[in-house]
């Protein structure tokens, strides 16, 4: 068994101000996505300018924060937030949903594409490879917060989390950081480096994320207010991954054999 590091959730305190690791991880994710976007935009034939990346990332940030928070409230704990509306704004304590954040980003990208007169799916293809680093940092934030731990296990790398009871558990946050952050980034970044049919990069992102998240949910403790939804193992996270997988497969297969569009557009 490994010792849980017990990192103070507060990274820096300046008088009454507290800067928490969870919030800083989101900041690191936004910065990494912005930097990667500018790097991709600088490549010949990308069809993007750095200023356009700045504008698009700004729209996406609002989509992530608003969509992620609203998604968590609606999908995971509506009853609690209906009774404690002030808690809606306490984002630093956690409570963000990837699927809600994804919907928020898609809506923000749609608004940006409409304003910039760009094809929606082409913009999503450009954005998709920029997302996994943010997922990596977000899961590290979950780990530092000691939340979203895994199910009990006897594996040698199990950890006892501060609020997870006396049982050693899967560090499922780290599993997700590796799969959804590192592996997903490597696959989608490589795939998007060549010309692909419009929507194919977005499709690969959706399919791989759904597979990785669905798999990790088997060793992740479900949210206590929801538990398992069916069959003694099906979680809300897995349910939300099903349409993502379906849409991703459709995007991958719909233009199979079609002419490839501009890379990273």
Curated annotation (Swiss-Prot):
Presence of keyword Membrane: yes
Membrane-spanning segments: 11-31, 56-76, 91-111, 120-140, 173-193, 198-218, 233-253
Cell division among keywords: no
Gene Ontology BP term (one): lipoprotein biosynthetic process
E.C. numbers: 2.5.1.145
First-level EC class: transferase
Signal peptide location: none
Keywords tagged on the record: Cell inner membrane, Cell membrane, Membrane, Transferase, Transmembrane, Transmembrane helix
GO CC terms in record: plasma membrane
GO molecular function: phosphatidylglycerol-prolipoprotein diacylglyceryl transferase activity
Known pathway: Protein modification; lipoprotein biosynthesis (diacylglyceryl transfer)
Residues binding a 1,2-diacyl-sn-glycero-3-phospho-(1'-sn-glycerol), per UniProt: 139
Record's subcellular location: Cell inner membrane
Family to which the UniProt record says this protein belongs: Belongs to the Lgt family.
UniProt protein name: Phosphatidylglycerol--prolipoprotein diacylglyceryl transferase
